[in-house]
Structures are given as C-alpha cells and as structure tokens.
C-alpha cells in the first residue's frame, strides 16, 4: 500500500489578509496577487509530478477558490473526488471576526492575560481567552476547537488509507493547520504563509509531520511563470 500523505495548503491571500483583519469564519475572496500566488503553487505541484487521489477543503469561500485554481493547474478539475468539510474551517474569532488583527492579538488578548505578545500564549489559552472576550458567544473553547480540527483531518487520512493510501490535497487555514501540527507534535508553527504547504504522513493510526510551511512549490511555480513571460 502506498504511503498515506496529506498536503495541507493554506489558502491564497485574501482582501482581509491584505488589510490585516481577522478572518475566521467570515470570508473575503482572494486578491489578484493572492490568485497569482496560488497559480504559482499549482504549477509548482504539477512540476513536482505529485499525484493526488482526492481533494478536500473547508467550506469557506477562500479555500474553495484556492482549490479550484490548484486543480485547474494540475488538470484535475472534475477528475478526482473533491468535497468540503466544515471541521477544517479556521478558528472562529466570535465578535472579533472581521476586526483588525492588531485590536485582538496586540490589544485585547495581551491585556486579558497581562502579557507582551499573544505568541506567549498556548493555543489552549488563546482559545479560552477568545471565549472570554467574545460578546457574541460564537468562539469555540479549546476542547471543541481542537476536537473538530483533529476529527476533520483524521477523517481525510482514514478515508485515504482505506482506499490504499496515496496523496490528498487539502486546503485549509493558517491557524487550523498550525493547531493540527501542534496536536501531533506539540510544536507551534508561526506565520504560515498563504500558499504554503505542510506535509503530514499517516500510518498505523498515527500522524507524523514531514514539513511545515514549505514555500518551495510556490517558488518553483513562480520561476516557471517568469520564464514563460520572458519567452513571449
């Protein structure tokens, strides 16, 4: 049986990413620059000769848009199974969804915990802090948040393994992918770039992290695009 491997992609850069707003369960489309970055990624994955057996994304518009571009570049649109899974959505920031990142992560949360920077908090502390400051009651506590993220990615791996293994292309979100990595090996990645690739292997019911935030596919695709422009 082939190795079971998940290629976890952070969606392309959106309007809210560009102007520094917390996106969470709210949604904005990819910008022109964001779309170009994902075309680069798709070309890079194609040039690497990777074969994908199935595709999954969250049910957010930005991940669906990202997946559409990648599948187009891979020539796989309509060729492999593709479904949405709300369990691999981004964290919900509750009443701060759509607010400026700085307000939440450099203002409210540091004041609540009396710290200098939000990176001093564990994911669990951050989740519980969001629940505390969320006036809408939408934010998820750590148990619920970590549980649905683990279940979402595990379901993909288990389905793929049952089908004989292979590669799955999964488009999700920065903090969601970071949380999954943390749940596997208790390391917390910071600043996963848009269009980055995190690779996770699954065997005998266990996950291992092969790489985090790899930008080499995008870089390779960008080089191909530049060469095509120069050749015109």
Identify the residue ranges that each predicted region occupies.
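Acidic, low-complexity terminal tails and accessory targeting/binding regions
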Residues: 2-4, 91-103, 107-113, 158-166, ...
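Active-site glycine-centered loops adjacent to acidic/histidine catalytic or metal-binding residues
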Residues: 11, 87, 173
């Amino acid at each position: 049986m082939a190795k079971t491997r998940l290629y976890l992609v952070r969606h392309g850069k959106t309007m809210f990413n560009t102007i520094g707003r917390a996106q969470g369960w709210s949604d904005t489309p990819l910008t022109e620059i964001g779309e170009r970055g994902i075309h680069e990624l798709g070309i890079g994955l194609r040039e690497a000769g990777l074969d994908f057996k199935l595709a999954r994304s969250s049910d957010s518009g930005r991940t669906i848009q990202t997946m559409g571009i990648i599948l187009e570049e891979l020539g796989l649109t309509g060729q492999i199974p593709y479904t949405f899974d709300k369990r691999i959505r981004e964290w919900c920031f509750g009443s701060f969804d759509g607010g400026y990142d700085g307000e939440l992560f450099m203002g409210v949360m540091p004041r609540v915990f009396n710290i200098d920077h939000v990176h001093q908090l564990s994911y669990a502390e951050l989740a519980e802090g969001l629940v505390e400051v969320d006036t809408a009651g939408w934010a998820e506590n750590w148990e619920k948040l970590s549980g649905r993220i683990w279940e979402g990615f595990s379901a993909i791996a288990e389905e793929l393994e049952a089908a004989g293994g292979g590669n799955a292309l999964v488009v999700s979100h920065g903090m969601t992918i970071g949380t999954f990595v943390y749940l596997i090996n208790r390391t917390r990645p910071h600043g996963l770039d848009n269009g980055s690739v995190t690779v996770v292997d699954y065997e005998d019911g266990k996950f291992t992290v092969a790489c985090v935030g790899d930008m080499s596919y995008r870089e390779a695709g960008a080089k191909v695009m530049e060469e095509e422009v120069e050749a015109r």
